[in-house]
A protein has these predicted regions:
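Bacterial N-terminal signal peptides that target proteins for export
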Residues: 2-16
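Hydrophobic alpha-helical segments
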Residues: 29-227
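Bacterial N-terminal signal peptides
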Residues: 15-25
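Helix-centric, low-specificity signal for extended rod-like, repetitive segments
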Residues: 6, 24-26, 102
Length: 227
């Protein structure tokens, strides 16, 4: 490809600027329509917790949790489960056992996380793990299959199995015998249960986000409604 092929014409640059501005305006408009029962800082029905909100035992747990800032405010995926600090600690331990402590390769693990976030409309972790998934080698077109709940035709066997497994687990609430058998064939018994654990840990945080109607941070996109 010639260098000149990469240069946009003035007209193309103008249209690109218009589309970018329109996209930004749409996000700003959507976020201006937030429900009235949300706290501005957390963009959820509950405020972020401060360390001073907790008793002595809770404060010790607070110091161990990811998302605890220098301002002593807890943000991130454990922000709302930490209303019971022991639950937040348990979820953190589950994450560490399932994700870094599991046997799944990064590609499979990140795809499983994206499926769990998609099935629970979990914007916070979706936005973080979409970028991580791309770095792990997940193609952007595959991510869009998950994002838009598209058919699995044309996907390779492993990717299709991860997505099908997650959709059956969360949407159908019943994993088909053939789907389970294929997962065991691909990742063995331990790997299949590791996949369930990975999906579960992100889904649980997603359920907390659903309960408090957590919205994406300002300027960040939100997942489209599942069809």
């Amino acid at each position: 490809m010639k260098k000149t092929d990469m240069i946009l014409s003035p007209s193309s640059r103008w249209w690109a600027a218009i589309l970018l501005a329109a996209s930004a305006s749409f996000i700003a408009y959507a976020q201006s329509k937030l429900p009235t029962d949300l706290y501005p800082q957390s963009r959820a029905r509950l405020p972020y917790l401060k360390k001073s909100d907790m008793d002595a035992k809770g404060q010790k747990i607070f110091d161990t949790l990811p998302g605890a800032g220098k301002d002593d405010i807890l943000r991130g995926p454990l922000a709302f489960s930490a209303y019971n600090p022991a639950v937040a600690q348990a979820l953190h331990d589950l994450h560490d056992a399932a994700v870094p402590g599991g046997t799944l390769d990064p590609h499979t693990r990140e795809l499983a996380i994206l499926v769990a976030c998609r099935e629970t409309n979990y914007n916070l972790e979706w936005n973080a793990h979409e970028a991580i998934g791309l770095k792990a080698g997940i193609d952007a077109r595959l991510i869009d299959v998950v994002r838009y709940n598209r058919p699995l035709a044309g996907l390779n066997e492993k990717d299709a199995t991860v997505i099908r497994f997650g959709r059956e687990l969360f949407h159908d609430r019943k994993v088909d015998s053939a789907t389970f058998a294929k997962a065991v064939e691909l990742w063995e018994k331990r790997g299949t249960m590791d996949m369930v654990a990975v999906m579960s840990t992100y889904a649980v945080s997603g359920y907390f986000a659903i309960a408090v109607d957590e919205h994406s941070p300002e300027g960040k996109p939100e997942l489209p409604a599942l069809k």
